[in-house]
């Protein structure tokens, strides 16, 4: 790839910032625009010296190659200006689809577990061979002359159909975007279409009934804990230090593996990584070494200690993700009370999953909900957080300006979950806890 100047419209988006970092590492000039409000991704961009500008059509210059975030429509002033200047314009997924062509590429798709699995795979392969990667938590690394390129493949609006990877891990299929997909059949159709673009093999979770139906031109290997899975985890042991298991491929032992991660899903994610490494004939002992020193990805069970409290920040916003996060908290802290603070994400999703939210949030020892986080597409709805708390014993709605109800808990774990701006609630709690 010859050196170029890439201009990102929406550079602070999690995928966009990761891609900007990859191109910067590969020796290109990179800059971009976004809102001025602080976003967690800009820390990495600033550290790399990548210029972030406020939106302004005057930013665009002749010779730039433009990469536009998928949330910006063609009538955005900067996109219009880029067209006037005759600049080459790519959408994020289109550009990524081109970029991965020069590598042994491994995508990770699925409604849940994408970022955690991509992060684990990127970390593990990086310790064994030259690996470039793009993770949905805003982390990206471009290594010149890489063998592997690991990337997160998002099914939203069928964007992942821009990718033709060598391998694809599919963690699960779920009806997670009711604003775009019409139902499970529609989501399955997208995954099957993508499966038929994979060049070497698919690694799919064996307990997902939809993934079990996959028909593809390449082999589909299933991973899980049952005897019918191709890659099987046996002798699983989960304790307060992490999770360990023996990995088998068709009854042949690959090796023993440990990850310092928590929750049932962590074993599955690690097994998927082992499966890809096994197909690429990588040394199982080296893979075990790298899995054992993984430290996690941003906003996935990110922990801190303050006073006598453990505070966890997690991106979980779908019922299955909340269940997995609370399960992880119970595994790591079996003797502490688990307090859930959840910010529902969008009215349509909250309404679609109301009974499931009630069920999974009831697993916590105490539950608080913030008001619903609305998206740019959807400002109001027919449901309120109070509709959910009313169905959970002892649950209540909590507001950023009054986090005092959390001060009654001591020597406990508070798990903040959400995909919106839940961090501002966490920050407000930390402020009053520190002052107490």
UniProtKB/Swiss-Prot annotation:
Sorted UniProt keywords: ATP-binding, Cell cycle, Cell division, Cell shape, Cell wall biogenesis/degradation, Cytoplasm, Ligase, Nucleotide-binding, Peptidoglycan synthesis
TM region(s), chain numbering: none
GO-annotated biological processes: cell division; cell wall organization; peptidoglycan biosynthetic process; regulation of cell shape
Gene3D superfamilies named in the record: Mur ligase, C-terminal domain (3.90.190.20), Mur-like, catalytic domain (3.40.1190.10), NAD(P)-binding Rossmann-like Domain (3.40.50.720)
One Gene Ontology cellular component: cytoplasm
Top-level class of the enzyme under EC nomenclature: ligase
EC number: 6.3.2.8
Pathway note: Cell wall biogenesis; peptidoglycan biosynthesis
Pfam families from the UniProt entry: Mur_ligase, Mur_ligase_C, Mur_ligase_M
Catalytic activity: UDP-N-acetyl-alpha-D-muramate + L-alanine + ATP = UDP-N-acetyl-alpha-D-muramoyl-L-alanine + ADP + phosphate + H(+)
Positions contributing to ATP binding: 110-116
An annotated Gene Ontology molecular function: ATP binding
Subcellular locations according to the entry: Cytoplasm
Family: Belongs to the MurCDEF family.
Functional note: Cell wall formation.
Name of this protein: UDP-N-acetylmuramate--L-alanine ligase
